[in-house]
A protein has these predicted regions:
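Helicase P-loop NTPase motor core
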Residues: 1, 271-274, 279-373
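Conserved helicase core region in the C-terminal RecA-like lobe
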Residues: 32-41, 216-220, 245, 359, ...
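P-loop NTPase Walker
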Residues: 1-56, 63, 67-94, 207, ...
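Conserved helicase NTPase motor core
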Residues: 1-3, 30, 64-65, 160-265, ...
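ATP-hydrolysis module of ASCE/P-loop NTPase motor domains
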Residues: 26, 49-173, 182, 186, ...
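Accessory C-terminal helicase-associated subdomains
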Residues: 174-175, 347, 413, 449-559, ...
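ATPase/helicase motor core of nucleic-acid motors
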Residues: 36-37, 313-315, 345-485, 498-501
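C-terminal accessory regions
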Residues: 574-651, 656
Length: 780
């Protein structure tokens, strides 16, 4: 008659196993997740006819990829998104493949994909899954926060990519209508909690469950939502029947509706409640506990407590300052060290590599795969799914066309890469159809692009023919070089793929940069393509790690919660990811930037305290204002404990600069003005009205840094008086503006004059000089 609820299924199973081991003579209490318990409540109510029968919908099925998916050519494998038949018997019109699984047509994500497409929130089908996942997160959060329809009608946005945010209400309304109108009616996991609470509103059902489980224990209480707390309150009887365990410093699931405030107010919510604070960490050594405690003490919204280490060992924390290009080799060396210990018969120690976002794991994963280093991972499949993104598919398809320039299929697949080149915008189907007629189905006439160029010339499309010729020249140079990293960077820069709209998204940028770094490991384009295709397949993945008993774990910070390892390496501890970009709009579950930073600090604290003995934190550019500046949490730890050693490893600046150049992301270097320094956005640079010698738009951070630190022999004066300018400069100004325009300057004209002359004129100074200018050059 004891009910013990926890956050995850594995945790519940582990607790039950530990209980059986330690108390073999006792009957085992009911260990479960809160969702599985609510499912029991609903099924009991259905059996008694108190509510109508609901069908529970879930997300992904575990159907394996059929052997038929291993196409005869690499290109076919890349572009074929689903076979004609899937294992469940549904056709590909009904299923959308995600990686090597198939979405259930009645899953929340699949339904939201259809709804977003129908409502025209997504112009491209390739965008639908990403936005559907974001919409599912928002909908789940607002349900767990018990928000009313009136509250949801307010503009709660979904982040739909770069500079695009839309209201959730139309999506939410259509989604709930789809579930309600299905026969039988459907519910998702969050609806299951809502229906369970409605059942417990019935006094008879509430009394039934209170009698069945007079004692309730809730583990990981900081992760429960307002809705889940309401269910717990319904199960609670008067007296000492409720026991909750949690750590508000480990509350990291605000996006799921977690509200640690309910736990912090426990003694006010329940009559005669007692709160016991545990201040001893039994996992980590002293330095790790000390640094973690100093970090988390900076949060304001927390219970007052101080953590101490039970261990008497000092432990070790080390900051590793290394370039992103070298990070993969560093992690490979560390993993090999632990594998050698295991092979040598030593007691194996565990190593975990933790990261904020899945894209950070792609580089070490590729290194391990290439060098046959066994490892396990929490949600590794989500990392591999990145290789099925539209951007990754376009890159691999382009490389396949470089390898097979005479293939119609390869041309058709790679077509989106160069279609924006100089505004080419060819109709793919028309071009291919005309080429097929001209050259025959088998295309025995050689490479396609020269033939396409000739076809366009015959149609009088001379500009487009010239551009196709330029593309073919670029492809020939890539073929001659035969370096996959060079090929991807040429695709970005020379074929202008870096101007593609999706490249504005931060995650896409990180993915492309990771692929370039991985490509630099391979000697040829073919070997890189083959490796990426092998990495994408779950079957190959299983073969890679079979029976190797790996001691290395790859995990997100969120998934690592509740785990512990002898050694932990936190990678990509940079400001862009931890706590993120302040200029981006906050999700609605954070009321302020401070709330967001405090949750990110809690997440960093959770990751750091997974380590028992050794913690290493990998940063980029610790002692500079580089584009990957270290997380402020690193500086906080160093201020609290300045004795933490910082180890600076050799950097590969050449590759990093080439990557930045290819990405085409501008940096604004400002020598003087309101915001001197290096900025990623023009608005942040604050250079409106300042002359070119004061600021410069650079294609890489290193170029911007060189400009910023370069000695200026003739500093540009800030003047209220128009100086005597060389006559050619005055004539050039008068070609741009008339005397009258100079007398009546608007902001745009003033900006142009400042840029052309290099002087920070005032409007009044220019107007006063206007007549003198005319006298100097009367012909103007």
């Amino acid at each position: 008659n004891i009910l013990i609820m926890t956050f995850g299924k594995k945790a519940a199973e582990h607790m039950a196993d530990v209980f059986r081991e330690r108390f073999p003579s006792f009957s085992v209490p009911f260990f479960c997740t809160i969702h599985s318990f609510c499912y029991r409540i609903i099924r009991q109510a259905e059996a008694e006819g108190l509510i109508k029968k609901y069908s529970l919908i879930v997300d992904e099925e575990d159907d394996p990829v059929p052997e038929a998916m291993d196409g005869e050519t690499a290109n076919a494998w890349i572009v074929d998104e689903s076979p004609d038949e899937v294992p469940s018997g549904r056709t590909k019109r009904e299923d959308k493949k995600k990686g090597n699984r198939y979405a259930n047509p009645r899953s929340p994500i699949y339904l939201l994909e259809k709804i977003l497409t129908k409502l025209e929130y997504c112009k491209k089908q390739s965008e639908a899954r990403t936005f559907a996942e974001q919409a599912a997160t928002v909908i789940g959060c607002l349900k767990n926060r018990m928000m009313t329809d009136e509250e949801i009608l307010r503009p709660l946005p979904i982040n739909m990519g770069a500079d695009k945010r839309v209201s959730i209400w139309p999506v939410y309304e259509a989604y709930q209508k789809e579930l309600a109108e299905h026969q039988p009616p459907e519910m998702d996991f969050d609806d299951m909690l809502i229906h369970a609470l409605e059942v417990l509103d019935n006094p008879n059902m509430q009394a039934f469950w209170q009698r069945k489980y007079p004692y309730v224990c809730v583990d990981e209480a900081q992760d429960t939502s307002l809705l889940q707390h309401a269910i717990v309150q319904k199960l609670h009887r008067t007296g000492d029947s409720l026991f909750m365990v949690g750590d508000d410093d480990q509350s990291i699931y605000a996006f799921r509706g977690a509200m640690p405030e309910a736990m912090l107010t426990f003694d006010r919510r329940y009559e005669d409640a007692a709160v016991h604070r545990m201040g001893v960490n039994f996992r980590s050594d002293q330095q790790i506990v000390l640094s973690g405690d100093g970090l988390i003490q900076r949060n304001k919204a927390r219970a007052k407590k101080t953590m101490e280490a039970f261990s008497k060992q000092p432990g070790e924390i080390r900051i590793i300052d290394i370039s992103a290009a070298r990070q993969g080799q560093f992690l490979l060396d560390q993993a090999r060290r632990f594998c050698k210990k295991q092979e040598g018969g030593e007691n194996p120690e565990s190593l975990a590599i933790l990261y904020r976002n899945n894209v950070s794991a792609l580089l070490p994963l590729a290194y391990f795969f290439k060098n046959d280093v066994p490892f396990v991972g929490n949600k590794v499949f989500d990392i591999l799914t990145l290789l099925y993104s539209r951007t990754a598919i376009n890159i691999l398809a382009f490389l396949c066309f470089v390898l097979e320039p005479d293939s119609f299929q390869a041309y058709s697949s790679a077509y989106p890469v160069w279609n924006h080149y100089h505004g080419l915008f060819l109709n793919r189907e028309t071009a291919v159809e005309n080429l097929r007629k001209q050259m025959g189905e088998e295309n025995s006439g050689g490479p396609i692009l020269p033939k396409l160029q000739a076809l366009l010339r015959s149609l009088g499309e001379m500009d487009k023919a010239r551009h196709i010729g330029e593309i073919w020249t670029i492809l020939q140079r890539i073929q001659a070089e035969d370096k996959p990293d060079f090929a991807i960077m040429a695709m970005l820069k020379e074929l202008e793929y870096n101007k593609n709209g999706s490249m504005k998204q931060k995650n896409v940028q990180l993915l492309v940069m990771a692929l370039i770094r991985i490509a630099s490991l391979y000697d040829s384009i073919l070997s890189f393509v083959e490796a990426m295709l092998a990495l994408r397949t779950k079957r190959k993945w299983d073969e890679h790690n079979a029976d190797k008993h790996p001691v290395v774990t790859l995990s997100t910070m969120h998934s690592a919660k509740g785990q512990e390892y002898d050694h932990v390496i936190i990678i990509d501890a940079v400001e862009d990811l931890m706590p993120g970009d302040r200029s981006k709009p906050l999700p609605f579950w954070h009321a302020s930037w401070q709330d967001h930073v405090e949750e990110e600090r809690r997440l960093f604290y959770v990751a750091a305290t997974r380590a028992r003995h050794d913690l290493r934190i990998v940063v980029n550019g610790l002692n500079s204002s580089s584009p990957k500046a270290p997380s402020p949490f690193i500086h906080e730890m160093l201020r609290d404990n300045p004795n933490i050693p910082v180890e600076k490893l050799a950097a590969d600046d050449a590759l990093e600069e080439q990557i930045e150049e290819a990405m085409g992301i501008p940096y604004f270097a400002v020598r003087r003005g309101k915001t001197p320094g290096i900025h990623r956005e023009y608005e942040k640079a604050g250079v409106e009205g300042y002359s070119c010698p004061v600021y410069r738009r650079c294609t890489t951070w290193r170029k911007a840094n060189r400009f910023l630190n370069k000695a200026v022999s003739c500093p540009v004066p800030e003047t209220e008086t128009a100086p005597d300018l060389p006559l050619p400069v005055e004539k050039a100004l008068l070609r741009l503006f008339s005397v009258q325009q100079l007398k009546e300057l608007d902001a745009n004209r003033l900006k142009k004059i400042r840029q052309k002359t290099g002087y920070l004129f005032s409007k009044e100074a220019i107007a006063a000089k206007a007549v003198d200018y005319a006298a100097c050059a009367p012909e103007y």
